[in-house]
């Protein structure tokens, strides 16, 4: 359980977010709030993810997939990771936010992937900072905690949305095609060639505004990086 502030930077754009994270009976609940600009909120419930967009007066609802917590996004050692990435663990002694951290570099072995540098809290393994790098090692995305409080309990109201959604349009999207991901049936679209290590990990139907027919949303991943493909009916 934790409550913190972090900055998310890409290029010349930066955003400050508050995150409140709770684990209840092994299931994570979460609320993200943008402290800049539109004030959007993302609430992860047990079954769904709700995105509140005040500037558009819209709430987007989609079924919850795998656990989207920070820990879930960490690379898992294994043959697939070893084939496509080189993992380097830094020495002890580094600190961030007054806490001991271990720096981990995840370096791609080809041109198809980005590199990653993670500052993991020694006690909890939480990433207190992460940097995505391009092929020459330049940072293209940075996520860094500026405040963090680890808590025994999180009040229920801290997970609830604060946006007044009265009069908002509710859009439900991302209906699953099947319980297990699978490629389109015979005669459908299939990838002709994927970068080494990538495989299909999710398959959903995505509504298209103004169209009665949904698009097919396929997600391919190598365990760290992910590629989305949208197929619209002709």
Region annotations inferred by a language model:
Residues 1-58, 83-133:
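N-terminal mature ectodomain segment of secretory-pathway/periplasmic proteins
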């Amino acid at each position: 359980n934790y409550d913190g502030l972090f900055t998310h930077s890409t290029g010349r754009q930066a955003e400050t977010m508050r995150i409140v994270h709770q684990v209840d009976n092994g299931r994570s609940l979460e609320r993200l709030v943008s402290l800049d600009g539109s004030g959007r909120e993302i609430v992860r419930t047990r079954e769904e993810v709700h995105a509140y967009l005040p500037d558009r007066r819209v709430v987007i609802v989609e079924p919850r997939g795998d656990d989207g917590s920070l820990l879930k996004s960490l690379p898992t050692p294994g043959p697939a990771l070893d084939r496509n990435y080189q993992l380097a663990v830094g020495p002890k002694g580094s600190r961030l936010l007054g806490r001991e951290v271990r720096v981990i570099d995840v370096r791609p072995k080809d041109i198809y992937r980005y590199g990653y540098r993670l500052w993991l809290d020694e006690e909890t393994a939480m990433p207190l900072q992460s940097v995505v790098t391009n092929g020459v090692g330049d940072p293209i995305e940075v996520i860094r905690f500026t405040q963090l409080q680890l808590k025994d309990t999180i009040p229920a109201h801290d997970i609830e949305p604060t946006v007044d959604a009265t009069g908002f349009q509710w859009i439900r999207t991302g209906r699953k095609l099947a319980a297990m991901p699978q490629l389109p049936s015979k005669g459908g679209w299939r990838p002709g060639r994927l970068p080494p290590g990538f495989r299909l990990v999710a398959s959903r139907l995505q509504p298209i505004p103004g169209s009665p027919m949904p698009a097919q949303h396929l997600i391919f991943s190598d365990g760290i990086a992910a590629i989305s493909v949208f197929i619209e009916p002709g």
